Amino acid sequence: MLAFAGVRLGGAARAVCLVLAGLTLAGCGINTIPTLDEQAKAAWSEVLNQFQRRADLIPNLVETVKGFAEQESKVLTEVVEARAKATQVQIPPDILTNKEAFGKFQDAQNNLSGALGRLLVVVERYPDLKSNQNFLALQSQLEGTENRIAIARRDYIVAVKDYNTELRTIPGRWWRALLYPEAEPMENFSVSEETTQNPKVEF
């Protein structure tokens, strides 16, 4: 039997005490760190999904542009090479707490965004390309994907900010020391970068 203040408690009373203790701990934020950790990881997965979606659109986009503007080989090559680097960058399991790996991923995606932006500027010189039905369909898909990338990045920024704040403040800092010593602050995109890097899809 469980003894409380000198009084022995039976099975039912003991169960009630354990439930109340659990609710008290939950109310004090014992589960907040793992909950925010999962939310940040889910947001990161969506970021990866949307960047991959963009990468999947690029080969068809390049081929379509090439059909109307083959002389723009320099810009087309830049896009192809930037895509290759972005899709080949290593994503280790600890990327969210690995500053170097996160930085390399970020740089690769930013380079691809820059190359795409330069390609879209070139497109302005070719009215026939801008009216091509296949290109219009790709334009719509790319525009939607860029919007989803922006949303996914913003969601990740917020999720990581909440998680990192919990690790630094009380009571999260206490729970981290007691129960989650392996929890580390996560890397994040900067808000200013998020607003400047995504290419604008306007034709």
Predicted region positions:
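A helix-centric hydrophobic-segment signal that preferentially recognizes long
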Residues: 2-4, 9, 16-203
